[in-house]
């Protein structure tokens, strides 16, 4: 049953990754009580994930609306996390913003030199431990 539902879902939402995101958003809506299943009687004993996939496969829910809800929820989550991180410690943000080009170039030069040494070791016939 689940395989046929997923196949029908892929016909509606061609990107499998987007399908997973949409199904998770719909499942979240059902689990939190934000909305009721479209056909409550038919899926009385089924898990919310199966109901979500069925609704997407049968076009019972608007996928554009689901996607917009998902984006909104992600933005709210990210806003909450970033505000807490940098409000409590403004020096962390200042350090990130004051990262100089010189520091970046120095770290790139060091990594390039170590890469060049590995190539030289390979040319000499010695095995390089990984």
UniProtKB/Swiss-Prot annotation:
SMART domains: RNA_pol_Rpb6. GO terms for molecular function: DNA binding; DNA-directed RNA polymerase activity. Its EC number is 2.7.7.6. GO terms for biological process: DNA-templated transcription. It catalyses: RNA(n) + a ribonucleoside 5'-triphosphate = RNA(n+1) + diphosphate. Disulfide bonds: none annotated. Keywords: DNA-directed RNA polymerase, Nucleotidyltransferase, Transcription, Transferase. SUPFAM superfamilies: RPB6/omega subunit-like. One of its GO terms (cellular component) is DNA-directed RNA polymerase complex. It comes from the Bacteria. Residues 107-130 are annotated as: Disordered. InterPro entries: DNA-dir_RNA_pol_omega, Pol_omega/Rpo6/RPB6, RPB6/omega-like_sf. Residues 115-130 have a biased composition (Acidic residues). The RNAP catalytic core consists of 2 alpha, 1 beta, 1 beta' and 1 omega subunit. When a sigma factor is associated with the core the holoenzyme is formed, which can initiate transcription. Promotes RNA polymerase assembly. Latches the N- and C-terminal regions of the beta' subunit thereby facilitating its interaction with the beta and alpha subunits. Belongs to the RNA polymerase subunit omega family. This is DNA-directed RNA polymerase subunit omega. It comes from Wolbachia pipientis subsp. Culex pipiens (strain wPip).
């Amino acid at each position: 049953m689940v395989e046929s539902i997923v196949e029908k879902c892929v016909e509606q939402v061609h990107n499998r990754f987007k399908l997973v995101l949409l199904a998770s958003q719909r499942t979240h809506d059902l689990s939190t009580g934000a909305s009721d299943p479209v056909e409550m009687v038919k899926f009385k004993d089924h898990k919310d994930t199966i109901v979500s996939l069925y609704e997407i496969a049968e076009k019972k829910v608007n996928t554009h609306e689901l996607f917009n809800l998902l984006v909104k929820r992600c933005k709210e989550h990210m806003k909450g996390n970033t505000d807490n991180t940098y409000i409590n410690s403004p020096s962390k943000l200042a350090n990130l913003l004051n990262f100089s080009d010189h520091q970046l170039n120095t770290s790139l030069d060091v990594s390039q030199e170590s890469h060049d040494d590995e190539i030289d070791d390979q040319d000499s016939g010695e095995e390089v431990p990984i």
